């Protein structure tokens, strides 16, 4: 139950396992991403923030891209990996940084079935329950704000 990444640097492919991270520097040609993916903010004030994208976009040099090599519920992966990413950010008090080198070393447990295959159904169920909790939290925050409690 391990999540490892494919990290593609401008020079070499570092073999890891489930995701690819494409580096798009200012000197390289633009990469158009049309697959469902996760992205993370590589530097700056929001460094380590991860986003689920299911639309086409051009990542810039401040955006790391994780494209799945196997079928995963990326919303579930996002929910699992976000707390880990914040802990990996370098120089949090200054200009935070989280580059491909740090991402390549991050490990996340992935549920597997009795045959050792990635269990997409349990990812979907976990994320569904997580999403319900997020909605309850938002509703409570709205009530508290409405009544200034």
Q: Where do the language-model regions lie?
A:
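DNA target-recognition domains and sequence-specific DNA-contacting regions of bacterial/archaeal
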Residues: 1-110
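Amphipathic alpha-helical coiled-coil/heptad-repeat segments
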Residues: 91, 106-149
């Amino acid at each position: 139950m391990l999540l490892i990444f494919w990290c593609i640097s401008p020079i070499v492919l570092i073999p890891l396992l489930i995701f690819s991270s494409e580096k798009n520097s200012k000197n390289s040609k633009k990469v158009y991403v049309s697959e469902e993916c996760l992205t993370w903010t590589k530097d700056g004030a929001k460094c380590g923030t991860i986003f689920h994208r299911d639309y086409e976009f051009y990542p810039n040099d401040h955006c790391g891209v994780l494209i799945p090599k196997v079928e995963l519920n990326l919303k579930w992966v996002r929910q699992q990996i976000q707390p880990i990413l914040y802990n990996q950010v370098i120089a949090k008090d200054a200009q935070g940084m989280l580059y491909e080198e740090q991402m390549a070393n991050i490990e996340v447990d992935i549920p597997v079935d009795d045959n050792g295959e990635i269990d997409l159904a349990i990812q979907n169920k976990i994320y569904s329950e997580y999403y319900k909790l997020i909605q309850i939290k938002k509703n409570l925050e709205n009530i508290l704000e409405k009544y200034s409690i």
